Amino acid sequence: MSHPTIESILQENRLFYPPDDFVAKARIHSLEAYNALYEKAKADPAAFWGELAQQELEWFQPWEQVLDWQPPNAKWFVNGKINITYNCLDRHLKTWRKNKAALIWEGEPGDSRTLTYAQLHREVCQFANVLKQLGVKKGDRVGIYMPMIPEAAIAMLACARIGAPHSVVFGGFSAEALRDRLIDAQAKLVVTADGGWRKDAIVPLKDQVDKALAHQGVPSVENVLVVQRTQQPVTMVPGRDHWWHDLQKGVSADCPAEPMDSEDLLFILYTSGSTGKPKGVVHTTAGYNLYTHITTQWVFDLQDTDVYWCTADVGWITGHSYIVYGPLSNGATTLMYEGAPRPSNPGCFWDVIEKYGVTIFYTAPTAIRAFIKMGEHLPRARDLSSLRLLGTVGEPINPEAWMWYYRVIGGERCPIVDTWWQTETGGHMITSLPGALPMKPGSASKPFPGILADVVDLEGNPVGVNEGGYLVIRHPWPGMMRTVYGDPDRFRRTYWEHIPPRDGQYFYFAGDGARRDEDGYFWVMGRVDDVINVSGHRLGTMEIESALVSHPAVAEAAVVGKPDEVKGEEIVAFVILEGSATPSDALQQELKQHVVNEIGALARPAEIRFTDALPKTRSGKIMRRLLRSLAAGQEVVGDTSTLEDRSVLDRLRQGS
């Protein structure tokens, strides 16, 4: 009996090796070393993770059992006692890192600040004491709705220090979206700012908090702490609202880290599904600490001299894991930038790299596509010679965008780590280890040691080499989410019941289509929800989009299916052109034929729609379900709280 899978139709055969001088200094410096680590972890996962936990982290009390697995519920480092901020801060004060830069911050208007590990520790302890004075106790949830300023990281670390789980809400979310998340988390206190800078404009954060809390909208919230960032006037509600700087003044910097059970709740982070209520992803303390620590160290090949910059916002999991917790646990210097490329300074990212001598640069494919559109002249006008490693995160990267990144930003000398992971996984799952594995443009490479990734059909049968299927993980890992906050049934249904268990083995269902090639490299083909069924052939959107973007006139493309009586679905492509290209019927035909030449007639788009923008979430992901509705001429329904620019939908409707 055959079971539906996803057809793979795009071939990419280019191969790139890390430079010899990079390999010579790398922590994991050969394919043989990677294979040995991977096989060691596969043979005895508990021993592998237990050994790393002992070597890499400091514990208040040792664990009794590495893993207690009662599918789908995992407990890691059972009955161990630990505090993530002790590992991120206190232990470094006993070494030369005490006076090392922990956090470099660059504000959009050009102001800046650097905090050493000693200074960051002091500010975290002071703010932890402020929280205690306001009645926040171990187990109380704290909402954080902040711009990208040091106080955002300080607030997260202060919460973790006293055992108060934080729930960071991205500062671009509306008051309604903020209210929903604060209600679900039953937050006792909210930390915010008067405003933040983004693209030369002030984002009025405190006003949004006031709207969210209006008319007892979130009855659990007792206090609001406000950082002065932009200095614009805001309403301060007596008895509820307090200025951060007033309460921080003169507060003791003595606040011992609370011993936390390994499985104590560390944070809740909300991720939107295509429709319905956002899911509160739960991460706990010890497993998350270890997993973000070791993935940061190995994937970015961290060295003591690195200046590491992840361009994400702390409101997303990438900011949690790879701006705050992972780098600081390793004693690294992590850079935080408040703004984004904007008309007044489109080359601001390259200015930051040049100014601080950034050595590791980690950004999203959507940003890389924007850089391509802005032109090579911007990065070429800056000195980017400090860079030694590049990374991508958030979605699969088209091979041509990968090549541009490698050539223009990395100067063909910086390895690229293309990292596949999710809010739910806590950290990197499939990724290159830069000194060990050759790179294939567009491939996430191989599973991280300890991650048993596979590609299967809907019955759990492994599919063949280069056959598309469903990406699954066959064994628990320390960084995995523990549940959906307050909804364990949703956790089980969403992640563990799509594919039935086989021989007692459960499958974590990632929701992505993928294939594995003859070298064991994984190629992520996009969300399963985005698969298009054309005449019985199930095609992933990613490969068709990659073919379109490989045309010199195309800056970005998004592909969706549109219902068709004969074929089931037909392919509709929304295309943003490069600056010099102009829309025309001739170009439409040329692009359709280009896809045929690259992939085959099966993938020929029925329609090419030119546009100047695509509907994206505030983290830069294309909202294809909205495009599906537009392509089909239907009304857009469902949750649009994550949509960054609502005017894009109106422009797309007018152009259809």
Curated annotation (Swiss-Prot):
Signal peptide: none annotated. InterPro entries: Ac_CoA_lig, ACAS_N, AMP-bd_C, AMP-bd_C_sf, AMP-binding_CS, AMP-dep_synth/lig_dom, ANL_N_sf. One of its GO terms (molecular function) is AMP binding. One of its GO terms (biological process) is acetyl-CoA biosynthetic process from acetate. Its EC number is 6.2.1.1. The modification N6-acetyllysine is found at residue 621. PROSITE patterns: AMP_BINDING (PS00455). Acetylated. Deacetylation by the SIR2-homolog deacetylase activates the enzyme. CoA binds at residues 198-201, 318, 535. Mg(2+) binds at residues 549, 551, 554. It catalyses: acetate + ATP + CoA = acetyl-CoA + AMP + diphosphate. ATP binds at residues 394-396, 418-423, 512, 527, 538. Pfam families: ACAS_N, AMP-binding, AMP-binding_C. Its cofactor is Mg(2+). Keywords: Acetylation, ATP-binding, Ligase, Magnesium, Metal-binding, Nucleotide-binding. GO terms for cellular component: cytosol. Gene3D superfamilies: 3.30.300.30, N-terminal domain of ligase-like. The keyword Oxidoreductase does not apply. Belongs to the ATP-dependent AMP-binding enzyme family. Catalyzes the conversion of acetate into acetyl-CoA (AcCoA), an essential intermediate at the junction of anabolic and catabolic pathways. AcsA undergoes a two-step reaction. In the first half reaction, AcsA combines acetate with ATP to form acetyl-adenylate (AcAMP) intermediate. In the second half reaction, it can then transfer the acetyl group from AcAMP to the sulfhydryl group of CoA, forming the product AcCoA. This is Acetyl-coenzyme A synthetase. It comes from Thermosynechococcus vestitus (strain NIES-2133 / IAM M-273 / BP-1). The gene is acsA.
